[in-house]
């Protein structure tokens, strides 16, 4: 296994090797799409299973007190989550991705990706005015970045791979075949 990883690292580290980068981008795109599909299921399944609504988008069918309780409970969970995290782990969303792309060459840390997943799922399920597209961008870029980091991809190629992850995540988020 170590030999294969060394050979793969040598293959993709060459600046003129576009085939290795294309294969890695394909893998990152598939992984990002799977992550976003699981994220959407993590949002839609609890809504349909536990709330008396017909569609995951129809919070107006809930009573006034149910909406208030749902929002309050979700807010409390999010406050406790972000208050307990160190400052460097609180970065989530599109602005975090842009900052990491600009100042850290596409290195997106895994803990921030996990926080994004959990916080966005709680916010959306509890009825906050949060869309799934912003978290999808972070989750897609983060998934691709983690794949690139695991194979030792160079900075300039890691940024390209993170962009491929974003495109795949947006495509999966909107149920479109290609971004």
What are these regions (language model features)?
Residues 1-179:
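Alpha-helical transmembrane segments and immediately membrane-proximal extracytoplasmic
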């Amino acid at each position: 296994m170590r030999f294969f990883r060394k050979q793969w690292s040598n293959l993709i580290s060459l600046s003129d090797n576009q085939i290795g980068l294309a294969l890695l981008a394909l893998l990152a795109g598939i992984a990002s799409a799977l992550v976003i599909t699981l994220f959407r299921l993590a949002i839609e399944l609890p809504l349909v299973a536990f709330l008396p609504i017909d569609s995951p988008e129809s919070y107006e069918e809930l009573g006034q007190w149910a909406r208030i309780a749902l929002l309050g409970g979700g807010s409390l969970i999010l406050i406790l989550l972000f208050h307990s995290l160190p400052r460097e782990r609180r970065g989530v969303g599109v602005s975090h991705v842009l900052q990491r792309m600009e100042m850290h060459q596409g290195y997106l840390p895994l803990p921030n990706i996990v926080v994004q997943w959990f916080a966005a799922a709680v916010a959306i399920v509890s009825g906050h005015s949060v869309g799934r597209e912003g978290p999808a961008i972070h989750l897609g870029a983060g998934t691709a970045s983690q794949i690139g980091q695991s194979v030792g991809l160079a900075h300039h190629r890691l940024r390209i791979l993170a962009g491929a992850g974003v495109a795949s995540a947006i495509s999966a988020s909107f149920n479109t075949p290609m971004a």
